[in-house]
Amino acid sequence: MIIVEVTFKIDPSLTEEILKEKFLETAPIYKNTPGLIRKNYISDLKNNIAGGIYCFDNMLNAKRWFDDERIEWITNRYSKPKLKFYQNYVVVDNESKKIISDDNM
């Protein structure tokens, strides 16, 4: 699996309520994203930063999603994002009470 950390600066005037509304507004976009397993919206209002943590099934799908058009969309909506891609070898899933590795994903 691939984890993508996306962060961007947000306007200091954005409140928690407004930011949550913006996140809920875009959430349906991700329901049919190829290869996306999960997306978590994140924020640090104290430092005017928000973003998302994405879990993709593979690097190809992650890179396809974060193409130039997607980066431009995020930039226009908030600000230019910073992206970091990570290989995810092992997951501890306490909901399902499983430990998942690359071998059994």
Each language-model region and where it sits:
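Conserved RNP beta-strands of RNA recognition motif
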Residues: G52-F56
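Short S/T/G/P-rich N-terminal loop/turn motif that feeds into the first structured element of a domain
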Residues: M1-I49, M59-D67, K84-M105
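RNA recognition motif
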Residues: E69-W73
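Conserved short beta-strand edge segments in small beta-sheet-based binding/regulatory domains
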Residues: T75-Q87
